[in-house]
Amino acid sequence: ESPDRSIREQAFKNLYSVYSAQKNTIAATYAASVKSDAFFAQARKYGSAMEMALSDDNIPLSVYDTLIETVNKSLPLLHRYVALRKKELGVDELHMYDLYVPLVPDADVKIPYEQAKATVKEALQVMGEEYCKALSHGMEGGWIDVYENKGKRGGAYSWGSYGVHPFVLLNHNDTINSMFTLAHEMGHALHSFFTWKKQPYLYADHKIFVAEVASTCNEALLMEHLLKTTKDKTMRKYLINYFLEQFRGTLFRQTMFAEFEKITHAMAEKGEPLTWEGMNKLYRELNLKYFGDAIVVDDEIDIEWARIPHFYNAFYVYQYATGYSAAIALSRKILNEGQPAVAAYLDFLSKGDSE
């Protein structure tokens, strides 16, 4: 994300040169993982490794295929965004190492935790009295470890145990991103809260397929609230860029990963070899398709598949894209339809693993 383009380029090349140096080993390791998936799927009488992976959560194959098909139809929107990025950065050629630099510098706004809490509460008023009462109870009732501290792990996390309220770990640092993280993690926490309130222990967990919906829906509602109430032009540009990057990174990028997994597993199931040359070629073709003509697809990016750890947990990443899509759709439904949509959403939060 460095504003210095030469630093971005050098970091990009240095990173992928390390993976390229180990390409034979990593390709053999990934190929073994894919072949293992294919073997166990065949041994257990599944039609494919993808069918076996999705069966754990009773997800139809059509969900996976429809995601890829629908996102592929929407690729012109990503191409427009890439072209906009090229224009805004003012470069003759946009490269892969230009994708992560912010189009708008981080908004120089300090948001203390108390202000972040108030803003999140205000944004989520649309969720109705029951949800907001639980939200306030969690925020004020000792659920959250707010600030960075010596020996404390980084990042953010929501965790809990049935029969006890959820706990939320934050490392709030007064940034806009920290405020979104608060909304996100409280979405997870309240998902658990409403499930535990209604379901017995047997059904008190959530599948990954739905877990990110509750957290991302809160983020989407916060974003809509901020865009509606913010008057400062620079701040609005920052928020819009933040939102667009979520679509690029969560919907489009994760679907590209999902498509890569689908193809590599199909190759293995047909007895085709999985070599670094073949996977580099495939990954390059996907990047060319997804990002369009406005960007130079650098040779170094061909090996990016080698650094994605999720690929060793086959057919996992698609859930980021479906979860994000569902969250955006639900947030719009809540904003447009009001109480009936809120009631249906709270019912969803209360289901756990019961259905």
For the regions a language model picked out, list residue spans one by one.
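Post-HExxH zinc-binding segment in Zn-dependent metallohydrolases
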Residues: 206-235, 243-245, 249, 323
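Structured ligand/cofactor/substrate-binding pocket environments in proteins
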Residues: 11-14, 18-27, 171, 175-185, ...
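Short beta-alpha connecting loops at secondary-structure transitions
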Residues: 167-171, 198-208, 237-246, 265-267, ...
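Active-site-adjacent bridging/hinge elements
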Residues: 46-47, 51, 93-96, 154-166, ...
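Active-site recognition of the HExxH zinc-binding catalytic motif
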Residues: 45, 172-195, 215, 220, ...
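C-terminal, non-catalytic "cap/extension" segments appended to globular domains
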Residues: 58, 87-97, 182, 190, ...
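Contiguous, non-catalytic segments that form substrate-binding/exosite surfaces or channel walls
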Residues: 4-167
